[in-house]
Amino acid sequence: MERKMYKSTVFPICCLLFALFDRGNALYGSSSPVLQLTPSNFKSKVLNSNGVVLVEFFAPWCGHCQSLTPTWEKVASTLKGIATVAAIDADAHKSVSQDYGVRGFPTIKVFVPGKPPIDYQGARDAKSISQFAIKQIKALLKDRLDGKTSGTKNGGGSSEKKKSEPSASVELNSSNFDELVTESKELWIVEFFAPWCGHCKKLAPEWKKAANNLKGKVKLGHVNCDAEQSIKSRFKVQGFPTILVFGSDKSSPVPYEGARSASAIESFALEQLESNAGPAEVTELTGPDVMEDKCGSAAICFVSFLPDILDSKAEGRNKYLEMLLSVADKFKKDPYGFVWVAAGKQPDLEKRVGVGGYGYPAMVALNAKKGAYAPLKSGFEVKHLKDFVKEAAKGGKGNLPIDGTMEIVKTEAWDGKDGEVVDADEFSLEDLMGNDDEASTESKDDL
C-alpha cells in the first residue's frame, strides 16, 4: 500500500518541479504579446526599428522580474500597433546587457530612433509605463514634423555609436574575482552595488564614463552584491555603493571616499596609479613570450634596436638602456610597453619595420593590434625619444602598415658583458676566399 502511494505522488511532484523550472527559464511564452529578443535579432528588432521600442532586461531567477511579467504583458497588449514591447534574458545573453550597462534586474530601457536609450525609472505599473511610452512617441512625432530626424533607424548615426558603446567596467563575480583582481599586479578600483540602490543607479552613468575614460590605464570593475553575497562578506561591505581600491596590497583594499563624479574618480585613479606604479622597465626582447607580455596588452609598444655589442661594448649599451629607462619612467603611468633588442637578433621584425643595416640605434612605435608602426626619424637622444612617444600617442600621423605576421624568435639574453672578438687564428683566409692555386689548376684542367 505504501509503495502505491509513493508511486502516485511521483508524477505530480515531477510535473510541479518541471513547471517551476520551465517558468524560471522563460518568463514569456510563445503566445505572449511580448517580443522575445536574442543577440541575433536585437539589431533588426530594436536598433533598426523605425518606432519606439521598450525593452525589459530580466533574469529568470529574479523575483521582481517574475512580479513584473503580467504587467509587462499588459503593457505589450495596450501598446500593440503603437510601440514594440520586448524582453531579453540578460542572464543568458550577458553580452547584450553589458553593452547597455545593465547591472540589475529588471532594467527597462526605451529605444527611440535617433537618440540614445532612455532608462525608465518610474512606477512599475502598466498605466505609468504606457504613459511614459506615449510621451516618447509624441516627442518622436514632433521631431519628425519639425524635420529633426529622418526616422530611418532607431538610434542611427553618431547617437547609435554612443548608445551601443559598452562599459569598460568589468563584471566581477566569485568565479573571476581572484583571477582578475587579487592575483593581478594591476591597480583595480571596484564598485560594490545593489540593483535596488538609488545611489548606485545615480552613480552608474558616472562610473561607466570613468571606466571608459580610464580604459587601458586603470581597471574598473563592479560586483552585484545581491548576487555575490560571498564577495560582499569577504570584503565587509555594509553599504551601497562601496568603492574599494585594490593597490599593491590586494589583501587590504582601501575605501574610496571622494566625490561620485566621473572626473573625481578619474583624477583619483590616476593619482593612485602613479603612487602604486613600480619602477619603469625596459625589457630585452628575447622571444615571443616577452613580446606578448610586454606588448600584447599595451596601447603602444616602443621597440628599440641597439647596436651590436662589438660596436658599442657594454658601457655604450648601458648608456642606451639608461636613456630608455629615463623615457619609460616619464611615461610609466601610460599603457605603453618598452622593449629593446640587439642588432640582428630579430631579423623578421627588423625587416617588417624597416630597420637594419647601419641604422642603429633605432626605435619604432608598434601597434600590433592595428598592424601598424611609426619609425623614429630624429636622433636617438632622450629629448627626441620623449617627443616621439608623445607624438605616437596622438596616433595616425606617420603610421605605416605591417605586412603579414611578425616572427619573433627565441634568443639568449645579454649577459651584461662586452662581446668576445673571434681570434684571427681560428680561421684562415683560404676558408673565406678559397684557394687561388687550386682554382687556377682546376681552370687549366678544364681547358
Curated annotation (Swiss-Prot):
Lineage: Eukaryota, Viridiplantae, Streptophyta, Embryophyta, Tracheophyta
Annotated function: Acts as a protein-folding catalyst that interacts with nascent polypeptides to catalyze the formation, isomerization, and reduction or oxidation of disulfide bonds.
One cellular component term from this protein's GO annotations in UniProt: cytosol
Domain Thioredoxin: 27-139, 161-275
Transmembrane segments: none
Molecular function per GO: protein disulfide isomerase activity
UniProt motif Prevents secretion from ER: location: 444-447
Signal peptide: 1-26
Class of the enzyme per the UniProt entry, highest EC level: isomerase
Protein's name in the database: Protein disulfide-isomerase like 2-2
Pfam families membership: Thioredox_PDIA6_C (PF24541), Thioredoxin (PF00085)
Tissues in which the UniProt entry reports expression: Widely expressed.
Domain of life: Eukaryota
